[in-house]
């Protein structure tokens, strides 16, 4: 069977840039899977995917024109039904053979073998392999249908649907066109190149010539990764030539790669007077609206230059450079206007307008929320022994920039602009910084708010949201989390654990709930539900940080509410697990838990006078001896030392279970031994539920 390189390309109108890489990769992957499933390509066959603004494509080497034939054996029916007493085929067998296209002459070749408890007839036939020319169109059609496209469109007079109009379909196997029709288009070998730098149609001679032909004749770099790498090389080279630096550009680089087919980087410039506007505004304007790459000096200060990724390569790029500078100037002027206009009104004066901004129809306005945040942030700051007045002031101003001109135009700048306006209004740096930082952490790996005042406001903001929405029954389900409550929960946990802050989570939740008007939060048991939700988030957070699963489960089984102490407890449990006594003590603890579950009523305190066996006396006295030391270590947060002391109980615990019948027939003896085990369990499980460590 002739094997050759296969090319499939869809030429389209400009595809959605943010979805382009996924469209290209999925399209190619699904075609490769279809070829492999039909035996036309090796199971480990490699392929390349291509994606540019106007095309998605795949090339795959070693694709056969026809798959190898294969033997297929299928069960027909039980012999008792298939053959009569003389061994001749019954009408039932003949009917089935006719339906399957098996000639009557094939009966003698049928195989008889046991199938379960009955003998059955089996037919083996050689099935011809799939032919590429007959199945490729169906494979491409299925790949198109499998693309992650939320909305499709129709064009022209046909019924085909796709994310954008499709103009050409190329399907080549080696040098031969593979016939087929997909999306109302007949397959061919012609495509088009760059919209401006190439003219007319381009014929692809062979599948292997696809990439070099597009580059040479079409002025298109079809490989997404290659185009991205080329843009990055040019960006870094230009920045180095100018003695400037780029900041984090990954997302913008991906987007720009999806917007150009023949990238060239040029340097643009704007008037230095615009640098009087906060640089975050200018950066966002250049990135979001113009897709420019801002340049910075070594200190991270914005320069009045930027890099342009053009879709054209020109010998004299002056028109491109001046044109882009001309386009960005009105944007920067708008930003300056918003900034100057906003500074005319103090943040304080904007608060009444928040009464007209609905936070949630069941939770009131943003102004009502601000009043809750102010009270809660003050309480948290007081618990921390921090500046309560500063925390209350920062919380009061935290949402005022939501009704500013700048944030109205660029919502991403909320908090950032609040800080600038607070400083302009004469607020202290601590208050202004907290206004900006109260949104942090906004995503995984984001910085935490610096300082206790900022942390207090950030906690208040997130706890108010969590308590409010849980209190009205708006709980995240599955992958639906419209109010970003999972993110808020992780933010609270990270602040408490990483700052760290000596605050009780249950008390914080109760404080937040107390700030709402009576009767507003009506969901049953919502505080307990919220704490369970946050513990589940904490479990995931600890696992992602590399914590041992069993150790995490052991620590969280005690439902700790001092989140700041969890890392130390986790480290102590992981150290304890490495001790030779750990497994035996964990197993004993598990046994104790099971015994106490079956006991009737509370065991009470053990009575030394009722102890009979030497082993139980030894255990009792050992527990009494080490209990103060364990409790002292726990009180001092020396959890590793506490567990090491407990490891010394192994000999007494082993001896107790080897020589003492806990469930004695005499009731007082039985109850006393249960009381001793309860006392032991209470001592052993002050740091974590040790029974969870048992295999």
From Swiss-Prot:
It is an enzyme of class 6 (ligase). It holds the Pfam family tRNA_synt_2f. Belongs to the class-II aminoacyl-tRNA synthetase family. Its EC number is 6.1.1.14. Tetramer of two alpha and two beta subunits. Keywords: Aminoacyl-tRNA synthetase, ATP-binding, Cytoplasm, Ligase, Nucleotide-binding, Protein biosynthesis. It comes from Azoarcus sp. (strain BH72). The gene is glyS. InterPro entries: DALR_anticod-bd (IPR008909), Gly-tRNA-synth_bsu (IPR015944), Gly-tRNA-synth_heterodimer (IPR006194). PROSITE patterns: AA_TRNA_LIGASE_II_GLYAB (PS50861). The keyword Phosphoprotein does not apply. It is found in: Cytoplasm. Its main location: cytoplasm. GO terms for molecular function: arginine-tRNA ligase activity; ATP binding; glycine-tRNA ligase activity. Transmembrane segments: none annotated. NCBIfam families: glyS. One of its GO terms (biological process) is arginyl-tRNA aminoacylation. The keyword Disulfide bond does not apply. It catalyses: tRNA(Gly) + glycine + ATP = glycyl-tRNA(Gly) + AMP + diphosphate. This is Glycine--tRNA ligase beta subunit. HAMAP family: Gly_tRNA_synth_beta (MF_00255). One of its GO terms (cellular component) is cytosol.
């Amino acid at each position: 069977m002739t094997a050759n390189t296969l090319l499939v390309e869809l030429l389209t109108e400009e595809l959605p840039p943010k979805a382009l890489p996924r469209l290209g990769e999925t399209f190619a992957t699904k075609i490769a899977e279809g070829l492999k499933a039909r035996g036309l390509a090796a199971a480990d066959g490699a392929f390349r995917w291509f994606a540019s603004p106007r095309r998605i494509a795949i090339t795959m080497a070693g694709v056969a024109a026809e798959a190898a034939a294969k033997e297929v054996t299928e069960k027909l029916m039980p012999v008792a039904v298939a053959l009569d007493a003389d061994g001749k085929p019954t009408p039932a067998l003949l009917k089935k053979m006719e339906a399957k296209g098996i000639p009557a002459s094939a009966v003698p070749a049928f195989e008889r073998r046991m199938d379960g408890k009955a003998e059955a007839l089996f037919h083996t036939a050689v099935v011809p392999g799939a032919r590429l020319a007959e199945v490729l169109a169906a494979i491409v059609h299925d790949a198109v249908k499998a693309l992650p496209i939320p909305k499709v469109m129709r064009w022209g007079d046909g019924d085909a649907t796709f994310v954008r109009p499709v103009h050409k379909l190329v399907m080549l196997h080696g040098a031969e066109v593979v016939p087929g029709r997909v999306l109302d288009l007949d397959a061919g070998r012609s495509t088009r190149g760059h919209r401006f730098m190439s003219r007319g149609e381009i014929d692809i001679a062979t599948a292997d010539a696809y990439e070099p032909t597009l580059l040479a004749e079409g002025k298109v770099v079809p490989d997404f990764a290659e185009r991205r790498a080329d843009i990055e090389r040019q960006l870094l080279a230009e920045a180095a030539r100018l003695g400037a630096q780029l900041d984090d550009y990954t997302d913008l680089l991906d987007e720009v790669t999806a917007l150009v087919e023949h990238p060239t980087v040029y340097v643009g410039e704007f008037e230095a007077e615009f640098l009087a506007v906060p640089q975050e505004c200018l950066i966002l304007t250049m990135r979001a609206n113009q897709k420019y790459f801002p340049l910075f000096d070594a200190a991270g200060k914005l320069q009045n230059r930027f890099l342009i990724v053009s879709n054209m390569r020109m010998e004299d790029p002056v028109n491109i450079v001046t044109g882009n500078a001309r386009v960005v100037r009105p944007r920067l002027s708008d930003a300056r206007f918003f900034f100057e206009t906003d500074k005319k009104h103090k943040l304080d004066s904007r608060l009444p307008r928040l009464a007209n901004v609905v936070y949630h129809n069941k939770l009131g306005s943003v102004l009502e929320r601000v009043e809750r945040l102010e009270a809660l942030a003050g309480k948290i700051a007081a618990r921390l022994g921090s500046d309560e007045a500063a925390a209350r002031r920062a919380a009061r101003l935290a949402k005022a920039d939501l009704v500013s001109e700048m944030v109205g135009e660029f919502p991403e700048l909320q908090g950032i602009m609040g800080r600038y306006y607070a400083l302009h209004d004469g607020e202290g740096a601590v208050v202004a910084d907290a206004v900006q930082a109260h949104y942090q952490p906004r995503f995984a790996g984001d910085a935490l708010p610096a300082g206790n005042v900022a942390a207090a406001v950030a906690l208040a903001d997130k706890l108010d949201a969590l308590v409010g929405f849980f209190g009205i029954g708006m709980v995240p389900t599955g992958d639906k989390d419209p109010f970003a409550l999972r993110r808020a929960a992780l933010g609270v946990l990270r602040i408490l654990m990483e700052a760290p802050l000596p605050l009780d989570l249950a008390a914080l939740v109760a404080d937040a709930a107390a700030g709402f008007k009576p009767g507003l939060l009506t969901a049953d048991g919502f505080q307990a539900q919220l704490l369970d939700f946050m513990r589940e988030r904490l479990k995931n957070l600890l696992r992602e940080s590399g914590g041992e699963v069993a150790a995490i489960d052991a620590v969280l089984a005690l439902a700790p509410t001092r989140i700041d102490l969890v890392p130390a407890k986790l480290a102590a449990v992981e150290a304890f697990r490495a001790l030779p006594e750990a497994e035996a003590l964990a197993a004993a603890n598990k046994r104790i838990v099971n015994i106490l579950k079956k006991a009737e009523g509370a065991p009470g305190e053990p009575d030394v006078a009722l102890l009979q066996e030497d082993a139980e006396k030894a255990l009792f006295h050992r527990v009494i001896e080490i209990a103060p030391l364990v409790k002292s270590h726990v009180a001092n947060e020396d959890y590793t030392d506490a567990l090491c002391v407990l490891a010394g109980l192994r000999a007494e615990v082993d001896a107790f279970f080897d020589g003492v019948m806990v469930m004695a027939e005499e009731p007082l003896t039985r109850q006393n031994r249960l009381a001793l085990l309860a006392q032991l369990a209470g001592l052993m499980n002050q740091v974590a539920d040790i029974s969870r460590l048992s295999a």
